[in-house]
Swiss-Prot record:
Chain intervals with Basic and acidic residues compositional bias: 487-508
Gene: N
Subunit structure: Homomultimer; forms the nucleocapsid. Binds to the viral genomic RNA. N0 interacts with the phosphoprotein (via N-terminus); this interaction allows P to chaperon N0 to avoid N polymerization before encapsidation. Interacts as N-RNA template with the phosphoprotein (via C-terminus); this interaction positions the polymerase on the template.
UniProt-annotated binding residues for RNA: 180, 190, 195, 260, 350
Species this protein is from: Sendai virus (strain Fushimi) (SeV)
InterPro entries, per the entry: Paramyx_ncap
Region (Ntail): 405-524
Region Ncore, annotated ranges: 1-404
Keyword Chloroplast appears in the UniProt entry: no
Positions of region (Homomultimerization): 440-461
Effect of residue 324 to I: Unstable form with complete loss of homomultimerization and replication
GO molecular function, one term: RNA binding
Notes concerning its domains: Ncore is globular and carries regions required for self-assembly and RNA-binding. Ntail is an intrinsically disordered monomeric domain in the C-terminus.
Stated name of the protein: Nucleoprotein
Family named by the database record: Belongs to the paramyxoviruses nucleocapsid family.
C-alpha cells in the first residue's frame, strides 16, 4: 500500500516530465518575419547627433501608422545603442524563432544637405528612400517626454549630464515598462511611475526626460504584441547574470530593473510557498491539502528545470506558465493567503478574491496564524536553546498583541463577494469547551452584523464567540471539524430565523444565502 501511495504522490511531477519530454523526430522551422534594425556607424561621433537618433527611434516606435514589427525594430535599435558593438549584442541575445534581424548602418556625411547629413547604408549600397523615411518630417501625436511640455532643452541636458546619462535615462525607462507590460497591462501606467520613483530620486532619470503616460502605454502595446522584443530583453538579463562582471552603470541599472521583472506573474506561486509551506504550521497535515502540496512539488520541479530562464516563464509566455496559476492548487493557495494577511499587513492589499478561493481554508489560515502555538517553530527551539519559561513569555506577548484584533480579514479584489467577518473568532479550545460553547452560543454573545455589501444586503454572523485567553494544544483535524460544525450550526440557525426576520424587517434573506453560497461559506 505504501508503494501505491508513493506512486500517486509522484504522479503529478512525472506526468509533467513526460509531457515536456521531446518526442524526437525532425525539427521543422516555423515562419520568421524580417525586422530592420538600425545601428550607428563610426562616422556618427557627435553626442547631440546620437541623442537625436535615440529620440528618433523612440518616436518611430510610438507611431501607430507603422506595423508593430517595425515599431519593435525601432525599440531594438534603441536598446542596442547601449553597446559599443550592437551587432554582437544582437548576435548574442537576438537569436529568435520568430524574427530575423537585418542590420542597417546610419552614417553621417558632412556633404549631404538633406536629412541632417544622415544616410542609411550597408556595406554594398546606400538607401536613400529609407533615409528619407527614417529622418523625414514626423508629427508626434503627443510629447515623448514630460519635459517637452515645459519646453525643456535636450541640448542643455546633454551639456550638463552628458550623453551616456541621457541615453541611459531613456533606455532604463523602456526596461521599466517591461515590468508590468506583459503581466499587468491594466496597471501599466501606475506601476511604471511607482518603479520609476527610485530612479528619479537617485538622479538616474532626470525630470525633463521622464516618459509621458502616452509614451509608456505605446511602448507597452508594442511589447505585448512583439514577443521577440521581450525575448531579446530577457536574454540580455540572462547573459548579464552569467557571463560578465564588468558591467557599465547602465547595465547595472538594467539589472536593478531586472529584479522587478524576475518572477513577474508568479506572485501567487511564490507567496503560496512562502506563507503556505515555509511557515511549517501543522495545518499542512490536512488531507485535503495533500493533492495541492503534490501539485506544488511538481511545479517546483518544473520551475527549476527551466534553468536561468525560470523567473521569466510568464513574460516569455512559456507553455507551462498557466500551470502556475493559483486555480491549480486552490486549497493550499487559499490557506496561504489566510496566513499571509495575518503575518504581513501589506498582503491585506493583495488580490485574494477569485472563483477558486476556498473560504474555509482562507479562514483556517488566519486562525492558525493567530494562534500563539502555531507561531512558535519547534524546529528552532533546541537550536536556539529556548527555555520553557521563555516560550511561555513569548506566548503571553503574542496573545497580548493579537488579543485586540479578533476580526477576520475578508478577501479583496477579484470577483469575490465582500464578506466582512467582524470579530468572528474560530474557537481553538478543547472538544469539551467547544460543545459547551455551542450549546450556549446564541444567548450569551448576541448578534453581530457585518458592514453593508453591494445590493443593500448584509452577511451576518450570529453570536460569534471570542477566543479564550489561554488556548490548549489540539490537533488540526479538530480545528477543521470545529469550523465545519460552526458553519453547519449557523446554517441551521439562519434557516430557522430567516422567515420571521424577513417578515419583521423586509430584508430579502434568500439573496443573502445566494451571496454567501457564491462566496463559498454556506449559509452564514
Amino acid at each position: 500500500m505504501a508503494g501505491l501511495l508513493s506512486t500517486f504522490d509522484t504522479f503529478s511531477s512525472r506526468r509533467s516530465e513526460s509531457i515536456n519530454k521531446s518526442g524526437g523526430g525532425a525539427v521543422i522551422p516555423g515562419q520568421r518575419s524580417t525586422v530592420s534594425v538600425f545601428v550607428l556607424g563610426p562616422s556618427v561621433t557627435d553626442d547631440a547627433d546620437k541623442l537625436f537618433i535615440a529620440t528618433t527611434f523612440l518616436a518611430h516606435s510610438l507611431d501607430t501608422d507603422k506595423q508593430h514589427s517595425q515599431r519593435g525594430g525601432f525599440l531594438v535599435s534603441l536598446l542596442a545603442m547601449a553597446y559599443s558593438s550592437p551587432e554582437l549584442y544582437l548576435t548574442t541575445n537576438g537569436v529568435n524563432a520568430d524574427v530575423k534581424y537585418v542590420i542597417y548602418n546610419i552614417e553621417k556625411d558632412p556633404k549631404r544637405t538633406k536629412t541632417d547629413g544622415f544616410i542609411v547604408k550597408t556595406r554594398d549600397m546606400e538607401y536613400e528612400r529609407t533615409t528619407e523615411w527614417l529622418f523625414g518630417p514626423m508629427v508626434n501625436k503627443s510629447p515623448l517626454f514630460q519635459g517637452q511640455r515645459v519646453a525643456a532643452d535636450p541640448d542643455t541636458l546633454l551639456q550638463t549630464y552628458g550623453y551616456p546619462a541621457c541615453l541611459g535615462a531613456i533606455i532604463v525607462q523602456v526596461w521599466i515598462v517591461l515590468v508590468k507590460a506583459i503581466t499587468s497591462s491594466a496597471g501599466l501606467r501606475k506601476g511604471f511611475f511607482n518603479r520609476l520613483e527610485a530612479f528619479r530620486q537617485d538622479g538616474t532619470v532626470k525630470g525633463a526626460l521622464v516618459f509621458t503616460g502616452e509614451t509608456v502605454e505605446g511602448i507597452g502595446s508594442v511589447m505585448r504584441s512583439q514577443q521577440s522584443l521581450v525575448s531579446l530583453m530577457v536574454e540580455t538579463l540572462v547573459t548579464m547574470n552569467t557571463a560578465r562582471s564588468d558591467l557599465t552603470t547602465l547595465e547595472k541599472n538594467i539589472q536593478i530593473v531586472g529584479n522587478y521583472i524576475r518572477d513577474a506573474g508568479l506572485a501567487s506561486f511564490m507567496n503560496t510557498i512562502k506563507y503556505g509551506v515555509e511557515t511549517k504550521m501543522a495545518a499542512l497535515t490536512l488531507s485535503n491539502l495533500r493533492p495541492d502540496i503534490n501539485k506544488l512539488r511538481s511545479l517546483i520541479d518544473t520551475y527549476l528545470s527551466k534553468g536561468p530562464r525560470a523567473p521569466f516563464i510568464c513574460i516569455l509566455k512559456d507553455p507551462v506558465h498557466g500551470e502556475f496559476a493559483p486555480g491549480n492548487y486552490p486549497a493550499l493557495w487559499s490557506y496561504a493567503m489566510g496566513v499571509a494577511v495575518v503575518q504581513n499587513k501589506a498582503m491585506q492589499q493583495y488580490v485574494t478574491g477569485g472563483t477558486y478561493l476556498d473560504m474555509e481554508m482562507f479562514l483556517l489560515g488566519q486562525a492558525v496564524a493567530k494562534d500563539a502555538e502555531s507561531k512558535i517553530s519547534s524546529a528552532l527551539e533546541d537550536e536556539l536553546g529556548v527555555t520553557d519559561t521563555a516560550k511561555e513569555r513569548l506566548r503571553h506577548h503574542l496573545a497580548n498583541l493579537s488579543g485586540g484584533d479578533g476580526a477576520y480579514h475578508e478577501p479583496t479584489g477579484g470577483g469575490a463577494i465582500e464578506v466582512a467577518l467582524d470579530n468572528a473568532d474560530i474557537d481553538l479550545e478543547t472538544e469539551a469547551h467547544a460543545d459547551q460553547d455551542a450549546r450556549g452560543w446564541g444567548g450569551e454573545s448576541g448578534e453581530r452584523w457585518a458592514r453593508q455589501v453591494s445590493g443593500g444586503h448584509f452577511v451576518t454572523l450570529h453570536g460569534a464567540e471570542r477566543l479564550e485567553e489561554e488556548t490548549n494544544d489540539e490537533d488540526v483535524s479538530d480545528i477543521e471539524r470545529r469550523i465545519a460544525m460552526r458553519l453547519a450550526e449557523r446554517r441551521q440557525e439562519d434557516s430557522a430565523t430567516h422567515g420571521d426576520e424577513g417578515r419583521n424587517n423586509g430584508v430579502d434573506h434568500d439573496e443573502d444565502d445566494d451571496a454567501a453560497a457564491v462566496a463559498g461559506i454556506g449559509g452564514i
